[in-house]
A protein has these predicted regions:
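An anionic, glycine-rich sequence signature occurring as long contiguous blocks
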Residues: 146-147, 152, 227-231, 236-344
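Short amphipathic alpha-helical "interface-anchor" segments enriched in bulky aromatics
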Residues: 332-366
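Electropositive, glycine- and tryptophan-enriched low-complexity nucleic-acid-binding patches
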Residues: 126-199, 322-323
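A short, flexible helix-boundary coil/loop motif
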Residues: 1-20, 24-33, 155, 245-297, ...
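Active-site-proximal, Lys/Arg-enriched surface segment
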Residues: 78-158
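Gly/serine-rich nucleotide phosphate-binding loop at the start of the catalytic core
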Residues: 2-71
Length: 409
């Protein structure tokens, strides 16, 4: 990097950003790769508006060739993103306790059909089918904030099977088509291998995944605690309970949909949850809960019939109204602990909003598979670098909303 391509100053951020870049990207074999990683990070942190490669380069250096070099680094340079993600994971874990591993979903709208993994898909936010990429991120929930540390891109079968498409997008031979459920499990498996702290509960929105039943069975058999929202149409059966335990009345073993069971409100002792905080008006929610079994989660092996807790929120006078239905294998946990984990899912959704608005989540313009992963890795690093100091500062100044949960009389 010549004097003309040296990054513009970041004032007090300079030294710490240098150290941060060296820690995460020190594995890159060439010095110029490490320098361009630093330029990209600085650009993400300082460039207002759209985070195109051209704008990132222009905000950091006056070099007329910087944009081309940065484009080469992101889209064509064959560097491995996994070591950087593992180091980012360790960097975050060293600085803050992790409350949950949260799975977030992201839709990346695209105009053309040449970006890797592009396909037609229904986007709930848009309310219609869109041309897009679709991916999952694993977030570390830190209590007040969630930080992404790993990503997976859905590769539809046509992209996986067509050698021309694979070659054009530079898809590695070991990358195959995987279902959304398999990608979620892959993220959790990778996290379990690389984390340096105790395993945290998995929190995820599986409400639009057709294979949610088998997936929760696989999570349980891998030894993970989990709390996930499930499709209302998922078949469950009441597990039954001793009288007075507050479980749904009805015939144990009879199959019913999760949504119907949650909407029935047939609970002897419902919970009342009070959501309160320094900046929010308290909200009172009724929580209906029951023990269930999930036929689709069973492995078929003897002794594998597991019991789960299913619950949903009921606003007074309004019923469930199609709200989320949650299920967990943490049947012995207090309801207030479970509702605290529900909030972690909302935190990852807020993080996705911030990544979109401030860190260029949807701004990657390249078409290659490695380029997508390079951008997502650097974007996650920039977000963590900015977010963790802000979280510590905020936690020092004010508390966070708490859920007071008690059984109603």
């Amino acid at each position: 990097m010549t004097a003309h391509t040296r990054p513009r100053a970041l004032a007090a951020m300079d030294t710490t950003l240098d150290d941060f870049t060296e820690r995460l990207f020190g594995h890159l074999p060439r010095a110029d790769q490490r320098r361009w990683a630093r330029v990209y990070l600085q650009g993400l942190l300082t460039t207002p508006g759209k985070k195109s490669v051209r704008r990132l380069a222009a905000s950091v250096t006056a070099s007329p060739t910087a944009s081309q070099s940065l484009q080469q680094f992101i889209n064509a340079s064959p560097w491995d993103w996994d070591p950087a993600r593992r180091e980012l994971l360790r960097w975050v874990e060293e600085r803050h306790p992790v409350h949950a591993w949260t799975i977030g979903q992201a839709v990346f709208p695209k105009r053309g059909e040449h970006s890797v993994g592009v396909h037609r898909r229904f986007d709930p936010a848009a309310g219609r089918a869109v041309n897009c990429q679709f991916g999952f991120g694993l977030f570390l929930s830190l209590g007040g904030m969630s930080v992404p540390v790993d990503w997976r891109l859905l590769l539809p079968e046509p992209w996986a099977a067509d050698p021309v498409l694979r070659g054009r997008a530079r898809i590695s031979p070991d990358v195959a088509h995987r279902t959304p459920e398999a990608l979620v499990l892959e993220l959790v498996d990778a996290m379990a291998v690389h984390t340096s702290s105790a395993h945290a509960p998995v929190v995820a929105d599986l409400s639009r995944l057709s294979g949610a039943g088998p997936l929760i069975g696989l999570l349980g058999r891998r030894g993970h605690d989990f709390l996930v929202s499930i499709p209302p149409a998922l078949a469950v059966s009441a597990a039954g309970a001793a009288p007075g335990r507050g479980e749904p009345a009805g015939a144990p073993g009879r199959e019913i949909t999760a949504g119907d069971l949650a909407r029935s409100g047939n609970t002897r002792h419902p919970y009342t949850a009070l959501l309160a905080g320094p900046a929010a008006r308290p909200q009172r929610l009724r929580i209906d809960s029951g023990l269930v079994r999930v036929p689709g989660a069973e492995s078929g092996a003897p002794g594998t019939r597991r019991t789960y807790r299913l619950f949903g929120e009921r606003h007074p006078g309004a019923g469930h109204g199609g709200g989320p239905v949650w299920i967990t294998n943490m049947t012995g946990h207090r309801m207030d602990d479970l509702l605290h984990l529900v909030r972690q899912s909302a935190e990852s959704a807020r993080a996705l909003g911030s990544l979109t608005e401030d860190f260029g989540l949807l701004d990657f313009e390249g078409r290659s598979f490695p380029g997508w992963h390079h951008h997502m890795t650097l974007m996650s690093a920039a977000y963590a670098y900015r977010a963790l100091p802000a979280l510590r500062d905020r936690q020092g100044r004010q508390g966070y909303p708490v859920l007071e949960v008690r059984q109603s009389a």
